[in-house]
């Protein structure tokens, strides 16, 4: 009887571990997809960005490069 209970507990623990490990793989893949998409969008934005002392006002509003801020002109 005790041996049967021990086997059942071991089986439950092993199946729980397998489920947790499988979910970890899914979340790792999702994380990689998210980071890849974010990197690609950042690269796309850098192509469209304007550099230092470029006009970025309300009528013509291209994004400043990530290290600049826009206050009518991109500035550090």
UniProtKB/Swiss-Prot annotation:
Q: List localization entries.
A: Secreted
Expression tissues: Expressed by the venom duct.
Which parts of this protein are propeptide?
A: 19-42
The organism encoding this protein is Conus ventricosus (Mediterranean cone)
Key word Disulfide bond present in the record? yes
Family in the record: Belongs to the conotoxin O2 superfamily.
Listed GO cellular component terms? extracellular region
- A Pfam match: Conotoxin
Instruction: Spell out the molecular function terms from Gene Ontology.
Output: ion channel inhibitor activity; toxin activity
Does Signal show up as a keyword for this record?
Answer: yes
Report the leader peptide range. 1-18
Q: Which UniProt keywords apply?
A: Cleavage on pair of basic residues, Disulfide bond, Knottin, Neurotoxin, Secreted, Signal, Toxin
What does the record say about domains? The presence of a 'disulfide through disulfide knot' structurally defines this protein as a knottin. The cysteine framework is VI/VII (C-C-CC-C-C).
Protein's recorded name? Conotoxin VnMEKL-012
Question: Which cysteine pairs make disulfide bonds?
Answer: 49-65, 56-70, 64-74
């Amino acid at each position: 009887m005790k041996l049967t209970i021990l086997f059942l507990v071991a089986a439950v623990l092993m199946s729980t571990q397998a489920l947790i490990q499988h979910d970890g793989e899914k979340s790792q893949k999702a994380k990689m997809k998210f980071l890849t998409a974010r990197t690609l969008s950042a690269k796309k934005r850098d192509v469209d960005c304007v550099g230092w002392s470029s006009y970025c006002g309300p009528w013509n509003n291209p994004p400043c490069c990530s290290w600049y801020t826009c206050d009518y002109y991109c500035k550090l």
